[in-house]
């Protein structure tokens, strides 16, 4: 009945607007002009005011600092140490932009799938025993060049999750002038690279340490605890591209404007809730988890933890994406050890330490289940540790489950 009434109303209003048209196909000139004027006005937006949200967003962007401007201000506020970081962090911003462009073109420019040599043969597995993806190889080169080429005399060596051993910047750049520097960098060039085939989020993780004074830079230089990190951060390539950074006094986020090609300071002093509704674990491995972890996950699902929150599972399969979700909404990310692999999957230097520093600086916690991640002394550059990151109440309770329960 409503449809019939609407049609009748349209017929009446139409007759009023166009005149009482005869049943013939021809119309008077005046009627045609009336209809032309009426319909053409529908597409005329010259006098239409822009939606307020669009206008407000332009005004807001004018007030936001660019990433480079933020670094200038911070280097002025913090002194010499921050001034050393400025060219390094600028280079990281450029690396993230380059990787973002490659990620966006991965499907059209054939950057997905396993990496192959000039003869079309799949490359050997990397040091982690994983098949190297095309994206791994390309992004690793970008990170090497950006870190080592940021400025002579700052970064002396780099260690990549994709390479067997650390590399001197003089070797990367082919110039001995790049052999001297007070800092070393560690990074995972593309976290979750297999996600690219399915157009799912991926990320980049990095950390910067100071060299030990008076000692030659070698592999031992990199074997520092996470609490000695000078700076750490990640880039998330997803619906938006965001760079999250800490220099040891809080966490800030910068969103890439694809039109202007700049990162803007959109997230100031990021803080994780003390507890939250998200848990992010690969539950395909549930039956191989230790008893404390299994009991904790069961408690999360029923809301029978001390927080009283009944949690929701969210798991993308990329550390950066899953941890960022937890950082924003609260909860816990976990990659525990299993019965067959007690150390788990995540690398201490390239993944757990940088992400752990960010979580702690945002008011959260980072644990192995039995202790603070940032207090772990690495024994080799590709060392792995069980990793739990997130809201302080959630992570603390997981640690309690490890204390109260033991494997049967």
Where would I find each of the regions flagged by the language model?
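N-terminal chloroplast transit peptides
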Residues: 1-26
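Helix-loop segments that flank and shape redox-cofactor active sites
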Residues: 115-116
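Eukaryotic, compositionally biased intrinsically disordered regions
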Residues: 28-30
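N-terminal mitochondrial targeting presequences
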Residues: 17, 25, 34-44
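IMPase-like, lithium-sensitive Mg2+-dependent phosphomonoesterase catalytic core
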Residues: 42-110, 124, 131, 137-408
């Amino acid at each position: 009945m409503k449809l019939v009434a609407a049609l009748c109303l349209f017929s009446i209003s139409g007759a009023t607007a166009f005149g009482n048209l005869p049943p013939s196909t021809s119309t008077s000139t005046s009627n045609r002009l009336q209809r032309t004027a009426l319909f053409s006005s529908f597409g005329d937006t010259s006098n239409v005011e822009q939606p307020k949200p669009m206008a407000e967003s332009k005004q807001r962007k004018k007030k936001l600092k660019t990433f480079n401007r933020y670094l200038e201000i911070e280097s002025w506020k913090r002194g010499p140490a921050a001034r050393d970081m400025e060219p390094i962090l600028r280079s990281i911003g450029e690396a993230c932009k380059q990787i973002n462009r490659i990620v966006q073109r991965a499907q059209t420019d054939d950057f997905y799938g396993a990496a192959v040599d000039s003869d079309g043969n799949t490359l050997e597995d990397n040091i982690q025993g994983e098949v190297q993806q095309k994206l791994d190889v390309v992004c690793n080169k970008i990170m090497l060049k950006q870190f080592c080429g940021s400025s002579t005399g700052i970064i002396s060596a780099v260690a990549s999750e994709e390479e067997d051993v650390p590399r001197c910047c003089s070797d990367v750049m082919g110039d001995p002038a790049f052999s001297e520097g007070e800092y070393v960098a560690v990074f995972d060039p593309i976290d979750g690279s297999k996600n690219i085939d399915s157009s799912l989020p991926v990320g980049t993780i990095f950390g910067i340490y100071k060299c030990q004074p008076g000692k030659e830079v070698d592999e031992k230089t990199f074997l520092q605890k996470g609490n000695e990190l000078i700076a750490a951060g990640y880039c998330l390539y997803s619906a938006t591209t965001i760079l999250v950074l800490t220099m040891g006094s809080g966490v800030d986020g910068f969103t890439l404007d694809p039109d202007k090609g700049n990162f803007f300071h959109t997230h100031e002093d990021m803080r994780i809730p003390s507890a939250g509704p998200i848990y992010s674990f690969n539950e395909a491995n549930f039956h191989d988890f230790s008893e404390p972890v299994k009991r904790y996950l069961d408690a999360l699902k029923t809301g029978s933890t001390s927080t009283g929150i009944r949690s929701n599972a969210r798991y993308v399969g990329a550390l950066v994406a899953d941890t960022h979700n937890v950082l924003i909404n609260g909860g816990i990310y976990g990659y525990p050890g299993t019965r067959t692999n007690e150390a788990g999957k995540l690398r201490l230097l390239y993944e757990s330490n940088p992400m752990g520093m960010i979580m702690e600086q945002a008011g959260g916690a980072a644990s192995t289940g039995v202790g603070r991640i940032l207090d772990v002394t690495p024994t080799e550059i590709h060392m792995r540790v069980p990793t739990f990151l997130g809201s302080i109440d959630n992570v603390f309770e997981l640690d309690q489950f490890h204390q109260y329960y033991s494997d049967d």
